[in-house]
Each structure stands twice: as C-alpha cells, then as structure tokens.
Regions:
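Alpha-helical cap/lid subdomain in secreted, periplasmic
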Residues: 50-192, 198, 202-220
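Short, solvent-exposed loop/turn segments at secondary-structure boundaries
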Residues: 9, 42-43, 137-142
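Active-site phosphate/pyrophosphate- and oxyanion-stabilizing loops and adjacent acidic/basic residues
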Residues: 16, 20, 49, 152
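Short catalytic helix/loop segments, enriched in acidic residues and glycine
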Residues: 9-24
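Short, small-residue-biased leader/transition segments that mark boundaries at the very start
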Residues: 1-8
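A short beta-strand-loop structural module common to alpha/beta enzyme folds
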Residues: 25-38
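Short, conserved active-site loop motifs that form the nucleotide-linked donor/cofactor pocket
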Residues: 4, 27, 160
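N-terminal post-signal-peptidase region of extra-cytosolic proteins
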Residues: 38-50
Length: 220
C-alpha cells in the first residue's frame, strides 16, 4: 500500500517517497514511521507491536533510528536510551509518570526489533540514520562513532542486512557542496525537504544493491 504524506511544515522523510524506487507491480510499501520517536518510544507506545503482528514470512522491514535517541532519559521528552550497543540496563524514575522503567542501550532495542522480524520469517534491513546538514572543514558530519556504529554492531550481531545510509547520502552531499546541500533540507540541519527525501530514498536503493539484498530485485 503506497503512502505519500507530507510532514508538518513541508518536512519530508524518505518513508513517504521510498515507494518511488520500487516496481509496485511486484511489491507493496507500508510506511509505519512516526516523527519524533526514538527506538525506545516507538516500542513503548505500542507502535512496534503493530508492525510485529502484521508481519508475514518473506516481508522486508527497513529499520532506522538515531535522530531522536539522544537527550533526556527520564525528564523532558524522555525518549533517549543508554548509549552503546551492549546488554547494559538501568532503572529510572520517570518524571512524567512517577513510575520506574528499565531502560536499555540503543543497540538492545535495535536487536529486539531485528530478532522479532527474523522470528516472523521476515527479512530485517537496518539503516544508519540520515546525515545532518552540519559541516566542518568542507566535510559533512558523519555518525560513525555513535549511532551509526551501534546500528552496524546490532546488524552484525544478528546477521541482518546493514546499509550505511549516513555515508551514502553524506558522500552525495559533499560532492554537491555546502551551498547546494541546503536545498535538500528544510529550515534546519536535520529535517529534509522533498528533494532530500528523494535523495535518501535513492541512497537506500543504492545500498540495497551494495548489500546484495534480495529486496533489490523489486527495484525499478
């Protein structure tokens, strides 16, 4: 089922346009993403459960988190996880609810999603998060030391396909240069314009080919 939904203030995510990369006579596309969610809050709000229960053997699931996974753990937006990809956990008293909650590492949540997909006989494809429009010395900022690294580690630990979307799109933006790169974002350094969403979707298609993932057979 194809979904093309414009985000608030003309911000677009690649999930709204990824269907344009596929032959829709061969495959259907379901965009289950929700703005502002971390891996933890996507699980806590029951959004992952809906994905899990809808999965059928042979489905492909693109999984990407990272932009909303830093910050406060138990105050404010309270959506961050523990940093890293290990098995650590810690109990926090949540300011908003007054209840205690066990919080795990970013990698733990990704591994749970991946293993849930595998349990259903579906195929997980894990993506590093899209690059931010932040530059230093003519180079765009990468996430290789934090969320990108932890995403790769979660994929490697579970045998999932991994696409370094951060690198693929960042390489494209660097070739365009800092001035032209601004056209791919919308009023901040994180949220993409429609043009940026299409670029990231094409980068995913490139990544599927690079990873030799069977989903590539359904590309246009």
């Amino acid at each position: 089922r194809r979904q093309r939904q414009m985000c608030i203030r003309d911000r677009w995510g690649w999930g709204s346009v990824i269907a344009d990369e596929f032959d829709l006579n061969k495959i259907s596309v379901e965009n289950c993403a929700m703005a502002g969610r971390s891996a933890r809050t996507f699980l806590d709000e029951g959004r992952w459960d809906k994905v899990y229960h809808a999965l059928q053997p042979g489905d492909f699931v693109l999984i990407q988190f990272g932009h909303n996974d830093a910050g406060e753990i138990n105050t404010g937006k309270a959506r961050a996880e523990l940093p890293g990809s290990g098995e650590e956990s810690k109990v926090f008293l949540m300011e908003k609810t007054g209840k205690y909650q066990v919080i795990y590492t970013f990698g733990w949540y990704l591994r749970k999603f991946i293993m849930d997909v595998q349990e259903k006989g579906a195929i997980p494809i894990v993506l590093s998060h899209t690059p931010r429009n932040k530059w230093k010395d003519g180079k765009i900022e990468r996430n290789t030391a934090s969320f990108g690294k932890w995403t790769r580690e979660a994929a490697e630990a579970t045998g999932a396909y991994f696409i370094d979307l951060n690198k693929i799109s960042a390489d494209k933006l660097e070739k365009k240069g800092i001035k032209k790169a601004a056209d791919y974002y919308n009023n901040d350094h994180t949220h993409t314009s429609l043009k940026g969403a299409h670029m990231n979707a094409k980068s995913i298609a490139d990544g599927l080919k690079m990873a030799d993932c069977p989903l590539k057979q359904n590309l246009k």
